[in-house]
Amino acid sequence: MHIQFPSKPTLPRACWEGRITAGSPGMPPDEIEIEPVRQSSDKMLYCEAESPPTVEKVKPARENSETDLEIEDDEKFFTTGQKELYLEACKLMGVVPVSYFIRNMEESYVNLNHHGLGPRGTKAIAIALVSNMAVTKLELEDNCIMEEGVLSLVEMLQENYYLQEMNISNNHLGLEGARIISDFFERNSSSIWSLELSGNDFKEDSAALLCQALSTNYQIKKLDLSHNQFSDVGGEHLGQMLAINVGLTSLDLSWNNFHTRGAVALCNGLRGNVTLTKLDLSMNGFGNEVALALGEVLRLNRCLVYLDIGGNDIGNEGASKISKGLESNESLRVLKLFLNPINMDGAILLILAIKRNPKSRMEELDISNVLVSEQFMKTLDGVYAVHPQLDVVFKAVQGLSPKKTIFLLTNPMKLIQSYADQHKITIVDFFKSLNPTGTMKMSVDEFQKVMIEQNKVPLNQYQVREVIKKLDEKTGMVNFSFLNTMKP
């Protein structure tokens, strides 16, 4: 049987001119379209490489069924075509091909961070990706791609509906880059749902453009705008966008310059947002004045699960305002307050607010720069009794003797393993013996109770909590089934 391979890879019309091309995405494979020859343009993603000669490959006769070998041959040809296309694009752009990209262009994840591509190297990559159906996540951080490179990427995205995640952080995009990105996402549908734009010199005008696009485009789910220069006006634009956007689920705004006005405006938009579950506002330094607005967000918002407000100059006064929101919040699970000037008094306000809320779902409170006392630990025991799923991370306990400190910090799994070894049983057998039903699962509440009451391996509250963290399925249950392979 003779198999005649096509003379060139079948590509979307953005790459080959004046040829019969594959239909647009969504067009049946047997439909084709004919385009007239266009004039060459350095601003378009065209690769005018001559088509390679027709290759005829003879294969031995086989049974009337496809085999893995036939499929592999087809895939090999597809890969060869992609490689040739990229090499021709590099020749056209006058750049040296990236060997890593050639080796990995048929993988789902391609990491080209810190490769020094520049605008023309980025364009060569974009040309190769126009027809690529394998790459779903592309990393291009720190390549100095600038606005010319961004233009090549968005032209590629008009044809490529397979790429889903893209990182173009730290590329000096500035206002013009923000304009190109915003225009594309405002006017075009795309498969991109995760976009990282950290450290691109975006200022207030850039915020206005990006927020205008995000006010109508709900395809983006995860957005990183950290390490930019948004301030009060940028905060107002972001707040207005968040009030109407129903797509974003994760937003990183850390390391910007939000002051009181901008941060409060941002919080106002968050109050009624119904999709955002993760928000990072750390390292903005907006102070206690914004804490009241944050407390209102926690009181009214029913969607936010993760909130990082570390490094924002929030003291005990701000902690008091935030605690008001924690008293009624039913969705938040993680609250990070690390690197804020909160002392033990502020920390007590926070944990008591959680205790007073029977519907709290809090799992982690990060106050890891706060020194606490033994009295705080006793108060915390009462909170843990109500909310056993909670983990409060603090710096250390003041005034403990070295012996007591060692007792508190001894790895509980090693103690249990030692007991199991002495009695010639497995660690799973130890836990099953504590379960009245003898099964591999218990509720967190019941497990905590029996671990405190058992006298085989004496453990304190904090060691029991460490055991729970290792076994917790995050469903309110602990599971012993994987302990045979767990290291102490």
Swiss-Prot record:
SMART domains: LRR_RI. SUPFAM superfamilies: RNI-like (SSF52047). LRR repeats lie at residues 134-155, 162-182, 191-212, 219-239, 247-268, 275-296, 303-324, 331-351. InterPro entries: Leu-rich_rpt, LRR-containing, LRR_dom_sf. Keywords: Leucine-rich repeat, Repeat. PANTHER family: LEUCINE RICH REPEAT FAMILY PROTEIN (PTHR24114), LEUCINE-RICH REPEAT-CONTAINING PROTEIN 74A (PTHR24114:SF49). This is Leucine-rich repeat-containing protein 74A. It comes from Homo sapiens (Human).
